[in-house]
């Protein structure tokens, strides 16, 4: 959101590790004892690094340069766009006499800034150009041109895309990696095992080998029926002698070779073709063409670099990773490995790094993270570009044959429409292109780090098995085992672990510290999941001395994929870098996560993302130390780019004079609407004249305080029941939270209306509306648009608009009036924009774009639209009954009662508690983290000094790290996940809290306090757990859910009210509710429910008339749904007759059931309220020319 200006040139400030050093001394007292040897990688790198590679920008070039200097391989060394244009070049005609080659793609500057795109509904993009060279082989003539390839969407500095004015995120996809896979399964008809091998490419046909229950080696080409593998080997050009030579040590293959009757390659090709295409005439040429098109044509078959890498590793080959086609050697090695696996042997000879090695023979686990890779944003867009270019290739070929060869230029051959259409479709409609979650900064970071197994080329949620969804040992340090949705997508959508990064092949790597002879070094190595199993890896919380040696002789370590075991420290190869290595950013923000049950931790992680930014953010007293990094990397706080001095601060701009003589200015976002209707606002933190370093936080964003994530409020909590009002997770809160706006938030809604050109004339934005009184338009300006600052409620007019009605034949009198008053008396209807039902608030902004303005500014209005107006309404929502509150441990509840402050239980010094939670919410849920947080929260609030405990040798004191021996009241503390404060330390600290100003300690060493009943002043009989807990207000607000309907729309077919708040629907009276009334024998009520109150069209109009006139209710008619049932039965060719009580047939004739005509017959207006009818008559009676 922040834009920085340096020496009058505008650049976008990017708060990431590429540009700014993020080291910062936090004022949190950290109780963690484990030092992390490396910083967390840039959290949005999963998005930005991939897009940098795609477009080949300077940041990517810098990383390639570093790779070449260090001899490493952390990024691909060819950019994504270059790769795609190299693949498609050259495009040749069928006679191969002409060719078109592409090279050197580059971008011009974007036409609009990110902010402009958001305000004016543009796509943030830059024009893409490429050099195209056409060569005419007959004449030798070469024509070169720079060709415009369309506007290419660009990534914003924070890893998002602006598509049509809305911010979107492309989610990374988790897919099966190309390569070779071996499996073993039980045969259905016997007790024997069947062995299979699949060679799966990135693009192209599968090749599968199988050894069945009769020990026969078969092959399936492109998933068709099985045939002899020997015939296949002969078809790809091997003679029987070559087969015998290659497989002389493999009796199973030799037996099959001896039995094979096919002798030559031609016979083999014919045989193969006959089985794949039984309907066509088999010939050797057809067979060869078929095989070549399946496996040996680089345009149609591509293993990709990752597929080649996987095949090399699995089969012990040493081919270049850029060799992306399938070779005879790969096929031979696959068959050898399969036969070795079938024979039950455990070793297979191969090569690794130029050495002869024995590879382990085993089946592959498809859910292992060595076999699943990530398709990042760059690769996903590249695949779309490839699809678009291949469609364009067809057009180019056709044009080569139809155009005059002399007149052809590259520009005349190329049609960029298919390329642009493919990319537009991907960003607009793909399952992986998501509306960005901007509820709070954490939601945004998580959205960008999400890993989805769904989407094109992935799994579907209906067919995904339990195994795919389950947590796998190889997820450790790569994908969080906790963070996942609760619904049908559980386990299919995950989140990248905190330290995880993605290598050039798309596999997730996690860092480990190298251990040499029991000494833990600071050298860090990143490893993929298939390398984990080859080493012995110790946990991060193993005790080390000051020199980095293990204190104990044994260490708990992972050996292969088995359970953790104790091993001698001399055999440890690596050690985890951090205890929070296995969890995601969201989960690492939960203190005492190690004391919470898994399901509740999952809920806690998900609910943090639903926290609404409050008017005044407050960071947690009890944190984990990850808050600062999560907030800074989200991009919602503004950081100083360079060291310098602040020269100017206002609410919307900060300027600094930098040490290098340049000036920078940082623009703050003020009261903008987020995608989730929350308020996006940035507030300066620094003062004029203050010194700043590079990376200093200059301004807070929504839900951040002092540059730390601040999603909720620290509130005084008591675990106690209160008159049953907090039964079953209900929550009782104090009136103080309402009065002081402690949990109040601002929500901004956007309403849009446009004036179009219609067949009957142009719509008009105006204040002059038909049949509308002056008081209804009092807040509109002379143009007919609401004034800023107006307080509006449901039904109020925001923008006045009239639309021409269909012209009817005019009477002489009307023609006379039309002649006198011109167009004034023309028939128009009121189509104004009104505040929807149930909404209210203050108008804070109005944006207007007219056709004239648009042409001047170069804006684009859709066809047929003359004027577009947007109105922004802000709501100030206080906390209220029915709103949902939650802690960070999955402890959620709905507010059932707001008590006056004087009725709340209070501490001995008179402090009333803020919230009462039910203690029964803890034991069965097993989320004890909330209890530990409560106690540590009190310690942090009260302050502590461990010297207050007279026992200097107390055992708990050795767990208090240096620097955490004492803290002033209100000191924020950090208890990192899996390295947090121990329960015994909390117990000790509770006895060392500082007394209040009267010298009293309100909470005892057991964490409990004597509370007094606010109503009687008497103490409660037992001490109660009291402390500070961080509570979040979730985006499940009762104002958005509560709904009531009196008169509203009906369904066209059934004539019953629609359903749901969005449709202004009614309350469904379903089949079970009908049974309930039947059980009570309430016949009249039931009859009324199913006719008058539902879909008896004529009847409900008559009832309305009877109520208005004060008459008795008329009898009900036939419900519309009965007529629908009749029609459905008649559509099944059934002749259905309707009989009355006397057995006489009723004629169900078609009649005009328009309720408005029925009401007109009865002489009243159904659309108006009774009190409005008189007013309307008055308005109609007044002469128009007054």
Curated annotation (Swiss-Prot):
It catalyses: RNA(n) + a ribonucleoside 5'-triphosphate = RNA(n+1) + diphosphate. Pfam families: RNA_pol_Rpb2_1 (PF04563), RNA_pol_Rpb2_2 (PF04561), RNA_pol_Rpb2_3 (PF04565), RNA_pol_Rpb2_45 (PF10385), RNA_pol_Rpb2_6 (PF00562), RNA_pol_Rpb2_7 (PF04560). InterPro entries: DNA-dir_RNA_pol_bsu_ext_1_sf (IPR042107), DNA-dir_RNA_pol_bsu_external_1 (IPR019462), DNA-dir_RNA_pol_su2 (IPR015712), DNA-dir_RNAP_su2_dom (IPR007120), DNA-dir_RNAP_su2_hyb_sf (IPR037033), RNA_pol_bsu_bac (IPR010243), RNA_pol_bsu_CS (IPR007121), RNA_pol_bsu_protrusion (IPR007644). GO terms for biological process: DNA-templated transcription. Residues 1149-1186 are annotated as: Disordered. GO terms for cellular component: DNA-directed RNA polymerase complex. The RNAP catalytic core consists of 2 alpha, 1 beta, 1 beta' and 1 omega subunit. When a sigma factor is associated with the core the holoenzyme is formed, which can initiate transcription. This is DNA-directed RNA polymerase subunit beta. It comes from Bifidobacterium adolescentis (strain ATCC 15703 / DSM 20083 / NCTC 11814 / E194a).
């Amino acid at each position: 959101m922040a834009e920085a200006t340096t020496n009058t040139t505008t650049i976008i400030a990017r708060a990431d590790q590429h540009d700014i050093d993020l080291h910062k001394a936090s004022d949190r007292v950290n109780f963690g004892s484990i030092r992390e040897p490396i910083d967390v990688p840039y959290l949005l790198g999963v998005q930005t690094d991939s897009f940098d590679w795609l477009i080949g920008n300077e940041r990517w070039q810098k990383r390639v340069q570093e790779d070449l200097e260090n001899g490493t391989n952390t990024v691909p060394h060819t950019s994504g766009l270059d790769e795609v244009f190299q693949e498609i070049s050259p495009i040749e005609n069928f006679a191969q006499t002409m060719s078109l080659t592409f090279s050197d793609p580059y971008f011009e500057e974007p036409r609009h800034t990110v902010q402009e795109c958001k305000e004016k509904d543009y796509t943030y993009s830059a024009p893409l150009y490429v050099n195209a060279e056409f060569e005419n082989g007959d004449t030798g003539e070469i024509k070169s041109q720079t060709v415009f390839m369309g506007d290419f969407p660009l990534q914003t500095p924070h890893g998002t895309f602006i598509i049509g004015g809305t911010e979107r995120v492309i989610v990374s996809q988790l897919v099966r990696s190309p390569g070779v896979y071996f499996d073993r399964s039980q045969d259905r008809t016997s007790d024997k095992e069947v062995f299979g091998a699949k060679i799966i490419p990135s693009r192209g046909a599968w090749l599968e080998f199988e050894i069945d229950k009769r020990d026969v080696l078969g092959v399936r080409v492109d998933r068709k029926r099985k045939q002899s593998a020997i015939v296949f080997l002969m078809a790809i050009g091997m003679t029987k002698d070559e087969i015998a030579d290659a497989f002389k040590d493999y009796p199973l293959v030799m037996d099959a070779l001896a039995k094979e009757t096919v002798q030559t390659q031609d016979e083999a090709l014919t045989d193969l073709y006959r089985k794949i295409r039984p309907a066509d005439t088999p010939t050797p040429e057809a067979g060869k063409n078929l095989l070549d098109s399946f496996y040996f044509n680089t345009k149609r078959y591509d293993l990709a670099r990752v597929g080649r890498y996987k095949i090399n590793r699995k089969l012990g080959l040493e081919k270049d990773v850029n060799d992306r086609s399938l070779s005879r050697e790969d096929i031979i090695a696959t068959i050898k490995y399969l036969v070795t696996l079938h024979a039950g042997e455990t070793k297979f000879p191969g090569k690794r790094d130029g050495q002869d090695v024995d590879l382990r023979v085993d089946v592959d686990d498809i859910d292992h993270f060595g076999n699943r890779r990530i398709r990042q944003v760059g690769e996903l867009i590249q695949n779309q570009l490839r699809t678009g270019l291949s469609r364009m290739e067809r057009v180019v070929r056709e044009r080569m044959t139809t155009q005059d060869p002399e007149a052809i230029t590259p520009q005349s051959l190329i049609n960029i429409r298919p390329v642009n259409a493919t990319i537009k479709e991907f960003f607009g409609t793909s399952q992986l292109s998501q509306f960005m979650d901007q509820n709070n900064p954490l939601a945004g970071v998580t959205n960008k780090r999400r890993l989805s197994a769904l989407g094109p080329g992935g799994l579907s949620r209906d067919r995904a098995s339990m195994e795919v969804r389950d947590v796998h040992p190889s997820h450790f340090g790569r994908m969080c085992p906790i963070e996942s949705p609760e619904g049908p997508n559980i386990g299919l959508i995950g989140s990248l672990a905190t330290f995880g990064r993605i290598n050039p092949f798309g596999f997730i790597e996690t860092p480990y510290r190298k251990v040499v002879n029991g000494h833990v070094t600071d050298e860090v190595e990143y490893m993929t999941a298939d390398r984990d199993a080859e080493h012995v890896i110790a946990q991060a919380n193993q005790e080390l001395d000051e020199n980095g040696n293990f204190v104990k002789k044994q260490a708990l370590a992972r050996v292969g994929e088995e359970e953790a075991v104790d091993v001698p420290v001399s055999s440890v190869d690596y050690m985890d870098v951090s205890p929070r290595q296995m969890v995601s950013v969201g989960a690492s923000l939960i203190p005492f996560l190690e004391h919470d049950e898994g399901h509740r931790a999952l809920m806690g992680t998900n609910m943090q993302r639903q926290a609404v930014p409050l008017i005044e953010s407050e960071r947690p007293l009890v944190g984990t130390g990850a808050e600062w990094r999560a907030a800074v990397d989200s991009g919602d706080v503004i950081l100083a780019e360079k060291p310098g001095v602040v020269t100017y601060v206002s609410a919307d701009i900060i300027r600094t004079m930098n040490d290098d003589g340049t000036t920078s200015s940082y623009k703050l976002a003020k009261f903008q609407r987020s995608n989730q209707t929350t308020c996006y606002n940035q507030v300066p933190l620094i003062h004029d004249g203050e010194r700043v370093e590079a990376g200093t936080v200059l301004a807070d964003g929504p839900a951040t305080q002092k540059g730390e994530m601040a999603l909720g409020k620290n509130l005084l909590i008591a675990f106690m029941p209160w008159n049953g009002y907090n039964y079953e997770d209900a929550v009782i809160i104090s009136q103080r939270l309402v009065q002081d706006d402690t949990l109040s938030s601002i929500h901004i809604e956007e309403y849009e209306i446009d004036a179009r050109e219609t067949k009957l004339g142009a719509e008009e934005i105006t204040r002059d509306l038909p049949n509308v009184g002056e008081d209804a338009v009092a807040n509109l300006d002379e143009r007919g648009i609401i004034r800023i600052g107006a307080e509006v409620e449901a039904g109020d007019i925001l923008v006045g608009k009239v639309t021409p009605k269909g012209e009817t034949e005019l009477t002489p009198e009307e023609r006379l009036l039309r002649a006198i008053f011109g167009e004034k008396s023309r028939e128009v209807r009121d189509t104004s924009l009104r505040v929807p039902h149930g909404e209210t608030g203050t108008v804070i902004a109005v944006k207007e774009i007219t056709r004239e303005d648009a042409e001047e500014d170069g804006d684009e209005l859709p066809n047929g639209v003359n004027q577009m107006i947007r109105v922004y309404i802000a709501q100030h929502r206080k906390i209220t009954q029915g709103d949902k509150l939650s802690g960070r441990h999955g402890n959620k509840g709905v507010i059932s009662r707001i008590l006056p402050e004087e009725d709340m239980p209070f501490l001995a010094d008179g402090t009333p508690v803020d919230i009462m939670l039910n203690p029964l919410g803890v034991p069965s849920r097993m989320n004890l983290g909330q209890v530990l947080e409560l106690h540590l929260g009190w310690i942090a609030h009260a302050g502590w000094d461990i010297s207050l405990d007279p026992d200097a040798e107390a055992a708990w004191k050795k767990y208090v790290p240096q620097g955490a021996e004492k803290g002033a009241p209100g000191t924020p503390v950090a208890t990192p996940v899996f390295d947090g404060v121990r329960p015994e330390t909390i117990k000790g600290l509770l006895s060392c809290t500082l007394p209040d100003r009267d010298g009293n300690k309100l909470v005892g060493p057991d964490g409990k306090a004597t509370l007094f009943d606010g109503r009687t002043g008497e103490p409660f009989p037992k001490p109660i757990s009291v402390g500070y807990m961080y509570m979040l207000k979730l985006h499940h607000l009762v104002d958005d859910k509560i709904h009531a309907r009196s008169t509203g729309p009906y369904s066209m077919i059934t004539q019953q009210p629609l359903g749901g708040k969005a449709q202004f629907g009614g309350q469904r009276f379903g089949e079970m509710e009908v049974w309930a009334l039947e059980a009570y024998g309430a016949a009249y009520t039931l009859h009324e429910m199913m006719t008058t109150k539902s879909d008896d069209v004529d009847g409900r109009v008559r009832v309305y008339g009877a109520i208005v006139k004060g008459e008795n209710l008329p009898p009900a008619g036939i419900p519309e749904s009965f007529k629908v049932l009749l029609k459905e039965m008649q559509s099944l060719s059934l002749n259905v007759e309707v009989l009355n009580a006397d057995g006489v047939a009723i004629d169900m004739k078609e009649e005009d059931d328009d309720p408005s005509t029925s009401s007109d017959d009865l002489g009243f207006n159904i659309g108006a309220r009774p009190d409005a009818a008189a007013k309307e008559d008055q308005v109609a009676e007044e002469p128009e020319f007054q």
